[in-house]
Design a protein with these regions (language model features):
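Sec-dependent N-terminal signal peptides
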Residues: 4-13
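Gly/Ser/Thr/Pro-rich low-complexity, intrinsically disordered segments
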Residues: 17-229
Length: 229
């Protein structure tokens, strides 16, 4: 009996040790996954039945609305499970992110690696903030209104930050800067693309924008940044 109780206690401890911690500001929801591994999952979104997944959401842009998955339909070269995959060239991307063995880098696209070189995940996107400095915002984009999401570093921790409501891109960037993130990289959004989910302490799954599963574009999603416990 003592052995059974010990096993149950250990399982409960393991569950409680990993969860997504949420902070909020007046305009932002901030998700801090407690993780041991990050990967770019391609082709099919991780399922809630995968108990080791803590958080997953869309990452890189998808090119065309195809009925079959192709790595070449993901914007720019990307690293999945330690392997570099060839994507299509995307001029809109200005930065990138890589992670491996507990270390990560946000970078300009010009510095994005040509080979995996030990990185477990990598993808390119629009670089919003680098080393605490806001990057130039294009005049065509600054007044675009949407709910936005970004992969960020804040006080030495990785987090996913999302606007609480529809706002201009320029204001979203201002909110990130006010929150004092060190780095920020855009994540793909829009109806269908914005669906995400995370795991609360205790293992319960919480969906973000579950209504997007009904959007026509939902089935065309291609890649997800995924945090594992």
């Amino acid at each position: 009996m003592k052995k059974i109780i010990s096993i149950i206690a250990l399982v409960l401890l393991q569950i409680s040790c990993y969860a997504v911690i949420i902070e909020t500001t007046a305009n932002l929801n901030v998700y801090y996954p407690e993780y041991t591994k990050i990967d770019l999952v391609c082709g099919q979104m991780p399922k809630a039945a995968q108990k080791d997944v803590e958080f997953c959401c869309e990452a890189a842009f998808t090119g065309e609305l195809l009925n079959e998955f192709k790595h070449s339909n993901i914007a720019d070269n990307h690293i999945c499970n330690g392997e570099m995959k060839k994507g299509y060239r995307c001029k809109a991307n200005t930065g990138g992110f890589v992670w491996g063995k507990g270390k990560w880098k946000f970078m300009r696209k010009a510095d994005y690696p040509t080979e995996a070189n030990g990185w477990n995940i990598g993808f390119c996107q629009l670089l919003i903030i680098k080393d605490g400095i806001v990057r130039a915002i294009g005049s065509k984009m600054k007044n675009n209104r949407n709910i936005y999401r970004a992969l960020c570093e804040k006080d030495g921790k990785l987090c996913i930050i999302e606007s609480k409501k529809v706002m201009t891109y320029e204001f979203f960037v201002k909110c990130l800067n006010t929150y004092k993130v060190t780095h920020a990289l855009y994540l793909d959004m829009g109806r269908g693309w914005n669906y995400a989910w995370y795991r609360e302490k205790g293992g319960k799954v919480k969906e973000i924008f579950p209504e997007s599963k009904l959007a026509p574009s939902y089935k065309y999603r291609t890649n997800w940044i995924t945090f594992y416990k």
